[in-house]
Amino acid sequence: MNVQTMILTLQEYWSKQNCILLQAYDTEKGAGTMSPYTMLRTIGPEPWNVAYVEPSRRPADGRYGENPNRLYQHHQFQVIMKPSPTNIQELYLDSLRALGINPLEHDIRFVEDNWENPSLGCAGLGWEVWLDGMEITQFTYFQQVGGLEANPVSAEITYGLERLASYIQDKENVFDLEWVEGFTYGDIFTQPEYEHSKYTFEVSDSAMLFELFSTYEKEADRALEENLVFPAYDYVLKCSHTFNLLDARGAISVTERTGYIGRVRNLARKCAKKYYEEREKLGFPMLKNKEADHEQA
């Protein structure tokens, strides 16, 4: 099964579980969790089931396209179910079956790995899912989002697409993966991997990036003053990515690092609080949609 078919299979499976299928969010981010589809929508009481592929940029992991397993950008398939269904683990195992992986024929383990994202003020109970000794998925029950208590609890399933595809295709080098017939992962991503790595480690202008961080930070606050949560959160993501570029460049000292993470976290918490307030003003409209569905049933 090639990567494209794998993605289509997961999309079809989760759409049948009443998930909205969305497209990748168009701002740089380090993980699918950072998308507003997860970070903001898991706040408050409104139901939310969603699935999407998220390209995730980790500048420090760039290896010029020469390392078989380390990438500047990898891909996650993200699933959020809010509130978490009681059978969420079985739903996940069924998704593996849809991919041709029979849990009864493989060693599948849920290894405790509680999750935390300090820069977003998020935390939860979690497990790594290991398939025959390789981690393929992170499974998390959100307890805190943007510093706010998660109520109801959302379940997050994050598949590492490259790792899962490497297992399914039995490839040791990610660049050898078949994306679709006639095109490998390397055909598509080797050049951007090299160029982004070169930019990150050799070309990026640290002084300019420091200025950008401060500019994005101010603009996030300015948007929040106007109760514009989504534009503000876009600038939080830009702050986070800019910080990651500076960190990868070695431009931030150990003592400065904590301060910069704190600044991003402070903005994320402001966005979380403002998102809740704005949805509350609207009367949590998706909650009403759910109630209407129950009445029709």
Curated annotation (Swiss-Prot):
It comes from the Bacteria. It holds the Pfam family tRNA-synt_2e. Disulfide bonds: none annotated. The keyword Aminoacyl-tRNA synthetase applies. GO terms for biological process: glycyl-tRNA aminoacylation. It is found in: Cytoplasm. CDD domains: GlyRS_alpha_core. GO terms for cellular component: cytosol. Gene3D superfamilies: Bira Bifunctional Protein, Domain 2, Class II aaRS and biotin synthetases, domain 2. Its EC number is 6.1.1.14. Tetramer of two alpha and two beta subunits. SUPFAM superfamilies: Class II aaRS and biotin synthetases. Its main location: cytoplasm. Belongs to the class-II aminoacyl-tRNA synthetase family. One of its GO terms (molecular function) is ATP binding. It catalyses: tRNA(Gly) + glycine + ATP = glycyl-tRNA(Gly) + AMP + diphosphate. Keywords: Aminoacyl-tRNA synthetase, ATP-binding, Cytoplasm, Ligase, Nucleotide-binding, Protein biosynthesis. This is Glycine--tRNA ligase alpha subunit. The keyword Lipid metabolism does not apply.
